[in-house]
Amino acid sequence: MTSADRRRDAVARIIRARRIGTQEELLAALERAGFRATQATLSRDLARLGARRVSGPEGAVYELGADGADGGLAALRGLVSSIAANASMVVIRTHPGSAPAIARAIDLAQPPEVLGTIAGDDTIFVAPAGELRPRRLAARLAELLGTPSALAGEGGERTH
Protein backbone atom coordinates (compact mmCIF):
# COMPACT_ATOMS: atom_id res chain seq x y z
CA MET A 1 0.00 0.00 0.00
CA THR A 2 1.42 3.37 -1.01
CA SER A 3 1.59 6.37 1.33
CA ALA A 4 -1.19 7.98 -0.73
CA ASP A 5 -3.38 4.90 -0.20
CA ARG A 6 -2.67 4.97 3.55
CA ARG A 7 -3.52 8.68 3.65
CA ARG A 8 -6.79 8.11 1.76
CA ASP A 9 -7.67 5.27 4.12
CA ALA A 10 -7.09 7.65 7.04
CA VAL A 11 -9.29 10.30 5.40
CA ALA A 12 -12.07 7.72 4.95
CA ARG A 13 -11.78 6.55 8.57
CA ILE A 14 -11.92 10.14 9.85
CA ILE A 15 -14.99 10.99 7.76
CA ARG A 16 -16.78 7.84 8.93
CA ALA A 17 -15.90 8.44 12.58
CA ARG A 18 -16.56 12.17 12.97
CA ARG A 19 -18.70 14.99 11.66
CA ILE A 20 -16.29 16.91 9.44
CA GLY A 21 -17.68 20.10 7.92
CA THR A 22 -14.62 21.67 6.28
CA GLN A 23 -11.39 20.66 4.62
CA GLU A 24 -9.53 22.60 7.31
CA GLU A 25 -11.09 20.38 10.01
CA LEU A 26 -10.18 17.33 7.97
CA LEU A 27 -6.59 18.50 7.45
CA ALA A 28 -6.21 19.04 11.21
CA ALA A 29 -7.62 15.58 12.00
CA LEU A 30 -5.37 14.05 9.36
CA GLU A 31 -2.32 15.74 10.87
CA ARG A 32 -3.29 14.46 14.35
CA ALA A 33 -3.40 10.99 12.80
CA GLY A 34 0.18 11.44 11.59
CA PHE A 35 -0.39 12.45 7.97
CA ARG A 36 0.64 15.70 6.30
CA ALA A 37 -1.13 16.91 3.18
CA THR A 38 -1.83 20.12 1.36
CA GLN A 39 -5.35 21.35 0.71
CA ALA A 40 -4.91 20.51 -2.99
CA THR A 41 -3.86 16.94 -2.17
CA LEU A 42 -6.76 16.55 0.25
CA SER A 43 -9.16 17.87 -2.38
CA ARG A 44 -7.93 15.24 -4.86
CA ASP A 45 -8.18 12.53 -2.19
CA LEU A 46 -11.78 13.54 -1.42
CA ALA A 47 -12.66 13.38 -5.11
CA ARG A 48 -11.03 9.98 -5.50
CA LEU A 49 -12.91 8.67 -2.45
CA GLY A 50 -16.20 9.98 -3.82
CA ALA A 51 -16.63 12.21 -0.76
CA ARG A 52 -19.12 15.03 -0.91
CA ARG A 53 -20.57 17.64 1.43
CA VAL A 54 -24.16 16.82 2.29
CA SER A 55 -26.51 19.31 3.93
CA GLY A 56 -28.25 17.95 6.97
CA PRO A 57 -30.25 19.21 9.92
CA GLU A 58 -27.03 20.16 11.75
CA GLY A 59 -25.19 21.71 8.79
CA ALA A 60 -23.10 20.40 5.91
CA VAL A 61 -20.70 17.52 6.54
CA TYR A 62 -18.47 15.34 4.41
CA GLU A 63 -19.74 11.87 3.59
CA LEU A 64 -18.22 9.16 1.49
CA GLY A 65 -19.73 8.01 -1.76
CA ALA A 66 -21.75 4.85 -1.91
CA ASP A 67 -19.88 1.89 -0.54
CA GLY A 68 -21.81 -1.12 0.51
CA ALA A 69 -24.95 -3.03 -0.23
CA ASP A 70 -27.26 -0.15 0.65
CA GLY A 71 -25.55 2.27 -1.76
CA GLY A 72 -24.74 4.61 1.11
CA LEU A 73 -28.35 5.00 2.24
CA ALA A 74 -27.47 4.46 5.90
CA ALA A 75 -25.36 7.62 5.84
CA LEU A 76 -28.33 9.64 4.58
CA ARG A 77 -30.83 8.61 7.25
CA GLY A 78 -32.40 11.54 8.98
CA LEU A 79 -32.52 13.69 5.84
CA VAL A 80 -35.96 12.44 4.76
CA SER A 81 -38.96 14.55 5.80
CA SER A 82 -41.73 12.35 4.40
CA ILE A 83 -42.58 9.54 2.01
CA ALA A 84 -45.94 9.48 0.21
CA ALA A 85 -47.40 7.16 -2.42
CA ASN A 86 -50.27 7.33 -4.88
CA ALA A 87 -51.45 4.78 -7.41
CA SER A 88 -48.42 5.17 -9.66
CA MET A 89 -45.37 6.53 -7.81
CA VAL A 90 -43.68 7.38 -4.55
CA VAL A 91 -42.65 10.92 -3.58
CA ILE A 92 -39.87 11.44 -1.04
CA ARG A 93 -39.49 14.88 0.53
CA THR A 94 -36.06 15.68 1.97
CA HIS A 95 -34.16 18.45 3.69
CA PRO A 96 -33.18 21.15 1.16
CA GLY A 97 -30.28 20.07 -1.03
CA SER A 98 -30.44 16.41 0.03
CA ALA A 99 -32.64 14.92 -2.71
CA PRO A 100 -29.88 14.39 -5.33
CA ALA A 101 -27.66 12.48 -2.88
CA ILE A 102 -30.53 10.32 -1.64
CA ALA A 103 -31.76 9.58 -5.18
CA ARG A 104 -28.23 8.65 -6.25
CA ALA A 105 -27.87 6.35 -3.24
CA ILE A 106 -31.20 4.69 -4.07
CA ASP A 107 -30.06 4.22 -7.68
CA LEU A 108 -26.68 2.80 -6.58
CA ALA A 109 -28.32 0.42 -4.10
CA GLN A 110 -30.35 -0.93 -7.05
CA PRO A 111 -33.32 -2.19 -5.05
CA PRO A 112 -35.27 -4.47 -7.39
CA GLU A 113 -38.49 -2.64 -6.47
CA VAL A 114 -37.24 0.63 -8.04
CA LEU A 115 -37.33 1.33 -11.78
CA GLY A 116 -35.71 4.74 -11.37
CA THR A 117 -35.62 8.09 -9.59
CA ILE A 118 -35.83 11.76 -10.53
CA ALA A 119 -34.54 14.30 -8.00
CA GLY A 120 -34.98 18.01 -7.56
CA ASP A 121 -33.53 19.96 -4.64
CA ASP A 122 -35.77 18.55 -1.90
CA THR A 123 -38.11 16.14 -3.70
CA ILE A 124 -37.58 12.73 -5.31
CA PHE A 125 -40.02 10.92 -7.61
CA VAL A 126 -39.53 7.16 -7.45
CA ALA A 127 -41.03 4.92 -10.13
CA PRO A 128 -41.81 1.37 -9.01
CA ALA A 129 -40.55 -1.51 -11.13
CA GLY A 130 -43.01 -3.83 -12.80
CA GLU A 131 -46.39 -4.27 -11.16
CA LEU A 132 -45.14 -3.46 -7.68
CA ARG A 133 -47.66 -1.37 -5.79
CA PRO A 134 -46.35 2.04 -4.73
CA ARG A 135 -47.51 1.42 -1.14
CA ARG A 136 -45.17 -1.57 -0.84
CA LEU A 137 -42.37 0.43 -2.46
CA ALA A 138 -42.95 3.32 -0.03
CA ALA A 139 -42.69 0.89 2.89
CA ARG A 140 -39.47 -0.61 1.48
CA LEU A 141 -37.93 2.84 0.93
CA ALA A 142 -38.95 3.89 4.45
CA GLU A 143 -37.12 0.81 5.73
CA LEU A 144 -33.99 1.57 3.66
CA LEU A 145 -33.99 5.24 4.67
CA GLY A 146 -34.74 4.65 8.35
CA THR A 147 -38.04 6.54 8.15
CA PRO A 148 -41.13 5.31 10.05
CA SER A 149 -43.30 3.33 7.65
CA ALA A 150 -46.52 2.95 9.63
CA LEU A 151 -48.29 5.59 7.54
CA ALA A 152 -46.71 4.82 4.16
CA GLY A 153 -49.52 4.29 1.75
CA GLU A 154 -51.32 5.13 -1.42
CA GLY A 155 -53.49 8.15 -1.95
CA GLY A 156 -50.87 10.60 -0.82
CA GLU A 157 -50.54 9.35 2.76
CA ARG A 158 -47.28 10.33 4.39
CA THR A 159 -44.83 8.35 6.48
CA HIS A 160 -43.38 11.11 8.58
From Swiss-Prot:
Pathway membership, UniProt: Amino-acid biosynthesis; L-arginine biosynthesis [regulation]
One Pfam short name: Arg_repressor
Predominant place of localization: cytoplasm
GO terms of biological process kind: L-arginine biosynthetic process; protein complex oligomerization; regulation of arginine biosynthetic process
Signal peptide extent: none
Subcellular location: Cytoplasm
GO cellular component, one term: cytoplasm
This protein's record includes keyword Plastid: no
Paired cysteines (S-S): none
Keyword line: Amino-acid biosynthesis, Arginine biosynthesis, Cytoplasm, DNA-binding, Repressor, Transcription, Transcription regulation
Gene Ontology molecular function: arginine binding; DNA binding; DNA-binding transcription factor activity
Family affiliation: Belongs to the ArgR family.
Alphabetical list of PANTHER family matching this protein: ARGININE REPRESSOR
Stored HAMAP family: Arg_repressor
Role noted for this protein: Regulates arginine biosynthesis genes.
Name of the protein in question: Arginine repressor
Organism: Anaeromyxobacter dehalogenans (strain 2CP-1 / ATCC BAA-258)
